[in-house]
Amino acid sequence: MNQARIWLVVKPSVGLPLLLGVVLLIALLVHGAILTNTSWYPTYFEGNW
């Protein structure tokens, strides 16, 4: 892993929650974009497929 030295600059107790938070934020943004920009996904999500 060539990015292993990042943990010499950022503590894992700060970096890991930050990384997971960014992943969560991106996932929520993608789901929100799909919900607002498609017509079939909200119907499927409500169980009316």
UniProtKB/Swiss-Prot annotation:
Binding site for a bacteriochlorophyll: H31
Keyword Metal-binding in annotation: yes
GO MF annotations in UniProt: bacteriochlorophyll binding; electron transporter, transferring electrons within the cyclic electron transport pathway of photosynthesis activity; metal ion binding
Cellular component, GO, one term: plasma membrane light-harvesting complex
Cytoplasmic face of the membrane: 1-14
SUPFAM superfamilies per record: Light-harvesting complex subunits
Periplasmic topological intervals: 36-49
Keyword terms: Antenna complex, Bacteriochlorophyll, Cell inner membrane, Cell membrane, Chlorophyll, Chromophore, Light-harvesting polypeptide, Magnesium, Membrane, Metal-binding, Transmembrane, Transmembrane helix
Ranges annotated as spanning the membrane: 15-35
Signal peptide: none
Recorded topology in the membrane: Single-pass type II membrane protein
Single biological process term from Gene Ontology: photosynthesis, light reaction
Annotated localization: Cell inner membrane
Function of the protein: Antenna complexes are light-harvesting systems, which transfer the excitation energy to the reaction centers.
Family indicated by similarity: Belongs to the antenna complex alpha subunit family.
Name assigned to this protein: Light-harvesting protein B800/850/890 alpha-3 chain
Species for this entry: Halorhodospira halophila (strain DSM 244 / SL1) (Ectothiorhodospira halophila (strain DSM 244 / SL1))
